[in-house]
From Swiss-Prot:
GO terms of molecular function: cysteine-type endopeptidase activity
Name recorded for this polypeptide: Cysteine proteinase 3
Enzyme class: hydrolase
Keywords, alphabetical: Disulfide bond, Glycoprotein, Hydrolase, Protease, Signal, Thiol protease, Vacuole, Zymogen
Organism name: Solanum lycopersicum
SS bond partners: 160-203, 194-236, 294-344
Pfam family, one: Peptidase_C1
Catalytic residues, chain numbering: 163, 303, 323
Positions annotated as glycosylated: 123, 252
EC number: 3.4.22.-
Domain of life: Eukaryota
N-terminal signal peptide: 1-16
Gene giving rise to this polypeptide: CYP-3
Family to which the UniProt record says this protein belongs: Belongs to the peptidase C1 family.
Amino acid sequence: MSRLSLVLILVAGLFATALAGPATFADKNPIRQVVFPDELENGILQVVGQTRSALSFARFAIRHRKRYDSVEEIKQRFEIFLDNLKMIRSHNRKGLSYKLGINEFTDLTWDEFRKHKLGASQNCSATTKGNLKLTNVVLPETKDWRKDGIVSPVKAQGKCGSCWTFSTTGALEAAYAQAFGKGISLSEQQLVDCAGAFNNFGCNGGLPSQAFEYIKFNGGLDTEEAYPYTGKNGICKFSQANIGVKVISSVNITLGAEYELKYAVALVRPVSVAFEVVKGFKQYKSGVYASTECGDTPMDVNHAVLAVGYGVENGTPYWLIKNSWGADWGEDGYFKMEMGKNMCGVATCASYPIVA
């Protein structure tokens, strides 16, 4: 093996170990004293070259605490990063209503991303006729429930297709704050581990509407503190002593009825929704998202989120939606989606709970 190969392997090893965080080093370990972000940056550049794109990749890897196990993986991830960067730049030159940008998913292929981040069950058993009761009232031009203080902080689902659990807890946390005047964090992990009998599949997908039915039948949902998130399928550990919220019933929006969804978001509270994520969406950065590539049927939707408001940007009406990919993604963990066309099926599988 050449000396250069040995150096590159050492660089890769230092890179992976250092990004694991200081807790992985003993204080007496001399490596901890010399490995800093600028040194890691230089180490990556030794592997992938000295181009501007290589520098972007090095800084991306450091910012997002990436862990690569070998020189070969660094090279592979750099190539994927370049492909995504090319797509980002090509899109942003078109002057469309939304921008793409580098985020923690830029070193992932679409197949890798889809495996770990999408999880709303297809064929969501949407309600042909919902049970929301409408009245003759003029809806406000804009709404943002964050301003009312009932929307809980953005969470991150990790490498688990549990988006449906975060949509569920987001709706419940908002309903709880609205009803009782204080915040609460509820257990996604209980839904992952315990709600399988209600046509949910843990890290392999599920639906908020079915989760509401499970919680109603089960008698409640534990708090996050009592039943913390692991991001893996596990054995059910529900404890009645740790219940944070109970569900009395839920309200379903008629399939594809955006006015009903708008009515509920405007006058009731945040609503769990699902839509189809297609390839470019993972790099969303800002603006009003729209796509001609996504579908809008119950068989198309693959990601559950939480509609927390709506508005108008540059003349385009939009939904304001809370995601579960962390606060560094999109607009502080949120995105805007074009309203009025049932874009990507946003009003296809919508529901919200009534809590006690």
